[in-house]
Amino acid sequence: MRKPTALIILDGFGLREETYGNAVAQAKKPNFDRYWNKFPHTTLTACGEAVGLPEGQMGNSEVGHLNIGAGRIVYQSLTRVNVAIREGEFDKNETFQNAIKHVKEKGTALHLFGLLSDGGVHSHIDHMFALLRLAAKEGVEKVYIHAFLDGRDVGPQTAKGYIDATNAVIKETGVGQFATIAGRYYSMDRDKRWDRVEKCYRAMVYGEGPTYKNAYECVEDSYANGIYDEFVLPSVIVNEDETPVATINDDDAVIFYNFRPDRAIQIARVFTNEDFREFDRGEKVPHIPEFVCMTHFSETVNGYVAFKPVNLDNTLGEVVSQAGLKQLRIAETEKYPHVTFFFSGGREAEFPGEERILINSPKVATYDLKPEMSIYEVTDALVNEIENDKHDVIILNFANCDMVGHSGMMEPTIKAVEATDECLGKVVEAILAKDGVAIITADHGNADEELTPDGAPMTAHTTNPVPFIVTKKDVELREGGILGDIAPTMLTLLGVEQPKEMTGKTIIK
């Protein structure tokens, strides 16, 4: 008989004392409550820098499963760059230094592309400010900003504030000028609407498009015409004599400071692909020997990468596999990539000895219409596997508290919590019957806050702590744990040595 060690992830199941708007607290959950009272338990931090996100930022399922599976803090691109700036490594970055050295030797210009906002989804304006300060420190004279306006990850009419903030840094450093302005609708298309990208290219390279004396004027004119940040037409900033402040020319350098690839790829390809055929670039195709991307955008972009991908070696799945143990990953469609691809550190392929079970999520318009989703089918499939003694390690995700929690509706979310509790009981009892151990936890909160203080639906994740229960009476747990400590704890329970790459610490004292 195998004694399975199971990790049960109750997706979106956070903890907070206030019961108002709290579906987790209001639901009847006798199984969870019993395990919480009977077995060693603590809470874990699942948001902010503890999971590699900026301080105070709510966690999410991708980040949560990455951290849990990796057994370490996995810094997301935004935080990675922030930490590099804070610790002084940003200015030493070899890729940035090469671009700066190039323009100084050639007497050419440095162009900064990117989304001008602090939304933190695709870019952060602080990273552009760090580049302006670096250029000033290194004595680069010609620095031009090609600002992509946001209006999507931030308010629809916030561009002026970001322009003001940029002008303050330009004044502080004595470096930088706005050269073009374009809404992200044009500059950051990802759906092959190349006519949009072409308008940007022609503004940046040929100085074609509406012209303005400064960035502020461009935004004000757009607003007057009912066009807000995201949709501002690619426009050119001109000097007193109506010539463009700057166009992009041979031997210039570009630093594209967006860190999220999907909406950066198309415009980067226009500048880096010699055989680009999506539209006619015209007679002027500037040769840019130093085109720097903040992160790895795509194999189709021929640029240098400032922050190269971090390979996650020796994740929990890999270590368990190398120890010769059999593992099962099981979830319904909505969370299947999380227990497989993300849990394995961004790896698609199965490890030796790994089996996967995918249960289809129900086909409904929104999950508040079916709060139980496919949890009963997932549970039946898993209990059958446990009874057949097939696996040493089980990774299970119950999706309901998160997927229904996103509705911001109390009644369906309470039902989702109650269905989750019912199935949690079935799975844990099957594991205990085999003399196994379950770890019950979550990747982030959601169902714990369904209403704002004024009664409006709250559809986002929360920053509340998540539960951590080990169904084994003879262990003691420490406080202050994070998601990256879960894999080392599982290895402790399995009696498998923790690899050096896993920098998390076991929660078992």
Swiss-Prot record:
Mn(2+) 2 binds at D11, S61, D443, H444. The keyword Metal-binding applies. The gene is gpmI. The active site is at S61. Essential for rapid growth and for sporulation. Catalyzes the interconversion of 2-phosphoglycerate and 3-phosphoglycerate. Its EC number is 5.4.2.12. The modification Phosphotyrosine is found at Y35. Pathway: Carbohydrate degradation; glycolysis; pyruvate from D-glyceraldehyde 3-phosphate: step 3/5. Mn(2+) 1 binds at D402, H406, H461. It is an enzyme of class 5 (isomerase). This is 2,3-bisphosphoglycerate-independent phosphoglycerate mutase. PANTHER family: 2,3-BISPHOSPHOGLYCERATE-INDEPENDENT PHOSPHOGLYCERATE MUTASE. GO terms for cellular component: cytosol. Belongs to the BPG-independent phosphoglycerate mutase family. Binds 2 manganese ions per subunit. Monomer. It catalyses: (2R)-2-phosphoglycerate = (2R)-3-phosphoglycerate.
